[in-house]
A protein has these predicted regions:
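Bacterial Sec-dependent N-terminal signal peptides
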Residues: 4-5, 14-41, 308-321
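Tryptophan-anchored aromatic micro-motifs
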Residues: 28-66, 70-73
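Contiguous, well-ordered beta-strand patches that form the walls/edges
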Residues: 77-273, 279
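Intrinsically disordered, low-complexity coil/linker segments enriched for acidic/polar
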Residues: 195, 288-289
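Short, exposed beta-strand-loop hairpins at the edges of beta-sheets
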Residues: 300-309
Length: 321
């Protein structure tokens, strides 16, 4: 059940990276319609040092834009790695997304996905300087057997220049567990309205993990998203694709590194951030499936470059059907 909950919540969060519809019922939003995820494409990429990376991911299901002041190009490489991972994994789960005029977000998806992602292929990228070929990536894409999600899992609206997605948490829990969770609405509201220390204690108890190290600002941000909706950005790219994404301000609390007060075997300070703490707790609680646990290393990679990050956009790359 935990595995299904993880994948369902991940799917809903991916759906939540887009939204559209104006609060004025007299206006028809230009975003209403059905969208496919962008086609996975790649080309050889030549670095300034005259080195070439084969099959460099150009487009795919995941949109990334990472600007930085670091002298080397490590963040640029990680950004391409994200495009590869998102472009490889999301098409194994998601077929299309419909923005309903009534305000619902509806997806055609794989109910119980079997994700094909060999961790050794990621390691190989670092050692060989080449990404898998487009044909190898597309070989695992799902083309049939999709399920249509209920209408009430997530809703969208446009407010103050942002596209806001409101998750229906009881409905999501009902879909994930198969048991009616509609009566949990008041309980969930009480938890989300609690002070950060109470929320950390409750979540820590559920996961059997210590979450006291997470900043109060991060807890307030997450509970605000759960109660009031997730504010996102949307734009039409030069190639006509629709990019729906969270920007750097959404990630600052999560990725900024700080010292734990401990030192490693080399006498250097041990650093952490809130997303590392939360991810490790989800892994320890059995919420993150085994095949997805290695993704934690990318949280550390991003955190290591966050102090030199000037712009960071992460979301979906979509094409109107």
């Amino acid at each position: 059940m935990k595995k299904n909950l993880f994948y369902l919540f991940a799917l809903i969060c991916s759906m939540s990276l887009f939204t559209a519809c104006d609060d004025d019922d007299d206006e028809v939003s230009p975003w209403i319609g059905t969208y496919k995820i962008a086609e996975y494409t790649a080309e050889d990429y030549e670095w300034p040092e005259n080195e070439t990376t084969k099959n460099w991911p150009m487009t795919g299901a995941l949109y990334t834009d990472w600007q930085f002041t670091r002298e080397d190009n490590y963040p640029e490489f990680i950004s391409a790695l994200f495009r590869y991972l998102g472009g490889s994994i999301l098409p194994q789960v998601l077929n299309s997304i419909t923005l309903d005029k009534s305000g619902s977000i509806i997806a055609d998806y794989v109910a119980s996905p079997e994700i094909a992602m060999d961790p050794s292929s990621i390691i190989s990228i670092f050692f060989t300087g080449a990404f898998p070929s487009v044909s190898d990536v597309k070989a695992n894409f799902v083309t049939s057997g999709f399920t249509t999600s209920p209408k009430d899992l997530a809703y969208w609206s446009e407010k103050n220049g942002k596209f806001v997605v409101k998750l229906n948490i009881p409905a999501i829990l009902t879909a994930a567990t198969g048991s009616d969770a509609s009566g949990m609405g008041e309980i969930i509201e009480t938890v989300l309205s609690g002070d950060p220390a109470t929320v950390k204690a409750l979540l820590g108890g559920l996961l059997n993990a210590d979450l006291s190290g997470i900043q109060n600002a991060t807890i307030n941000q997450i509970t605000s998203w759960a109660k009031d909706g997730i504010p996102m950005n949307i734009k039409i790219a030069d190639n006509g694709h629709v990019h729906i994404y969270l920007d750097k301000s959404a990630f600052d609390n999560l990725f900024t590194l700080r010292s734990t007060g401990e030192t490693d075997n080399f006498g250097k300070p041990v650093l952490t951030n809130d997303l590392i703490i939360l991810w490790n707790a989800l892994v320890a609680g059995g919420v993150v499936p085994e095949e997805a646990q290695a993704a934690g290393i990318f949280i550390q990679m991003i955190g290591g470059c966050w102090s030199v990050t000037t712009n960071f956009n992460l979301g979906l790359d979509l094409v109107r059907n």
